[in-house]
């Protein structure tokens, strides 16, 4: 027997299907967790699994994460990059990984006391950094955000540092003295000192050694 649908009934059916699809989309904000420590990954999973609006996946290494990102297409990536802070040379693997993250909001955390900030420090428009001890606060905030608010995190590329601060920082990391940096950039010694002070204040560290530790990770972002 043929069932005749009124225009009102058909409209209700179509609208209900649209809302079901929207609800399905909202309930699947994707988060990728990367940490070699099984217990950390398990703890993050357990905490975030309390939220029905999140779809989680975890891997132990940056190398595995690179292929997972292409597959999973996460909107948020939470990654422990402490081991790469100890590598002062060029690291193609880390550089490639960070390039693959360009469509996600990335939170880098470190097994260190610094950065000395209770909230993530935005290095660029999409990448922030924090000390691991503040990871619980980050997870708490992530468990409350919706799919749409997650998308809003993706903003235009920006930098925490000015172009001249970048140049000063690069020379500083090579242990170049202030007078030589000043000569190269055609600025005064006092301006170099001022830039160094602003750099450490922005990244929330106390000295060159702490900055160098973090710099080994974020130098690939600029």
Region spans (language model):
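Helix-turn-helix DNA-binding segment
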Residues: 152-191
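Hydrophobic residues on short alpha-helical segments
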Residues: 166-170, 200, 212
